[in-house]
Design a protein with these regions (language model features):
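N-terminal Rossmann NAD(P)H-binding glycine-rich loop of SDR-like oxidoreductase domains
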Residues: 1-29
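Short mixed-charge
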Residues: 22-42
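Adenine-nucleotide cofactor-binding loop residues
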Residues: 40, 45-46, 63
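Short loop/helix-cap segments at secondary-structure boundaries that form the rim of catalytic
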Residues: 46-54
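Conserved acidic residues
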Residues: 55, 76-77, 119
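NAD(P)H-binding glycine-rich loop region in Rossmannoid oxidoreductase-like domains
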Residues: 59-100, 132
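Conserved Rossmann-fold NAD(P)-dependent oxidoreductase catalytic core, especially the SDR/UDP-sugar
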Residues: 106-136
């Protein structure tokens, strides 16, 4: 089983990778435990702190279709999509927020669709998606 973690150098990406390495298996599409052969950590900066032959660190832009095609192939079975621009940065640079959080996600989903089988995609978000307090 090959696993991809976008945002792999971030806090959640590194924690998830460490937990997956510790477990050593993940459920496949048939809900059977399968051995994890490789975890690719894909991010704008290298993911540091791993000394395990199952870890493959790839730097690149989640907005780049060619970079996505290099990390999502016919052997990719699971994609944890954690790459995102956080709310405060997205509020300061609205175009960047749209580009990464919407356009890049769509490109990632499209790349998964094009590989001939559809890898399982797990998308994470945060409490920030709910916005602020509701008006009275």
């Amino acid at each position: 089983m090959k696993v991809l973690i976008t945002g792999g150098a971030g806090f959640l990406g590194r924690r998830l990778a460490a937990k997956l390495l510790q477990r050593g298996t993940l459920k496949n599409a048939e809900l059977r435990e399968e051995k994890i052969e490789q975890i690719t950590l894909f991010d704008m900066v290298p993911a540091l702190g791993f000394n395990d032959p199952r870890i493959n660190v790839v730097t690149g832009d989640v907005n780049d279709p060619e970079a996505l095609a290099k990390v999502i192939d016919t052997e990719t079975t699971s994609v944890f999509h954690l790459a995102a621009v956080v709310s405060s940065q997205a509020e300061d640079d609205f175009d960047l927020g749209l580009s990464v959080n919407i356009d890049a996600s769509r490109r990632l989903f499209e790349t998964c669709r094009k590989v001939g089988h559809c890898p399982k995609v797990i998308f994470a978000s945060s409490l920030a998606v709910y916005g602020g307090a509701l008006p009275e």
